[in-house]
Regions:
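Fe(II)/2-oxoglutarate oxygenase catalytic core
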Residues: 1-166, 172-197
Length: 197
């Protein structure tokens, strides 16, 4: 009979606090809300997906924010690699970024991003790391990893929506995750991926 063993392994999910300051978070939200001509709406009811986003790479007026995000991301990713004990011969020597997006989820009992993974085909298989930066405090709308435990009494790992925090994790199938519905106020995040080059 085939026997199985469970191994304790790092989940490679990390949260770093206060990487983006309050003023920059508020500025990005304000710019998002005053740029409705740049909004792209996404809605797939069968997949529990509904949100509005701006793809910052499509609009030159966001260059300053993108540069700032990339700079802080470099520091956070270096900390992540160190904290996860990722050796240099394992980490990509050179990488690039997928276009950064700002997403808004309204407290309308509809906006959310259902359970999914970020690498699903050959085209997006160049992604090797995912990140979200939370732009506002929100007691709901957290990011949920249902297959990772973070305490003896829970069967999932939950990243709360706390302004300025960055969540970093691998984008492949073991890291299936969901963005829960916000309840009382909109949820804003900056999201993107690191790519193999």
């Amino acid at each position: 009979m085939l026997q199985t063993k469970n191994f304790d392994m790092d989940n490679y999910i990390r949260i770093y606090e206060d990487v983006l300051d309050k003023q920059m978070c508020e500025n990005i939200i304000h710019k998002f809300e005053t740029s409705p001509h740049q909004h792209e709406s996404f809605s797939e009811h069968f997949a529990n997906v509904s949100f509005v986003q701006i793809d910052l790479g499509k609009h030159t007026e966001w260059e300053k924010e993108v540069k700032h995000i990339h700079n802080l991301l470099l520091k956070s990713v270096a900390q992540y690699a160190n904290d996860c004990n990722i050796k240099k011969n394992i980490w990509p020597l050179d990488f690039t970024y997928e276009s950064v997006r700002v997403k808004r989820y309204l407290p309308n009992n509809q906006d959310q991003f259902g359970l999914h993974v970020d690498v699903t085909n050959l085209t997006n298989a160049k992604r090797f790391l995912s990140f979200f930066i939370y732009l506002d405090d929100n007691e709901e709308g957290q990011t949920i990893f249902p297959y990772f435990e973070n305490s003896p009494i829970m069967d999932e790992f939950v990243s709360p929506c706390k302004r300025g925090n960055i969540l970093i994790f691998p984008p492949m199938w073991p890291w299936a995750h969901a963005g829960a519905k916000p309840i009382r106020r909109p949820k804003y995040i900056v999201g993107g991926y690191l790519h193999y080059k």
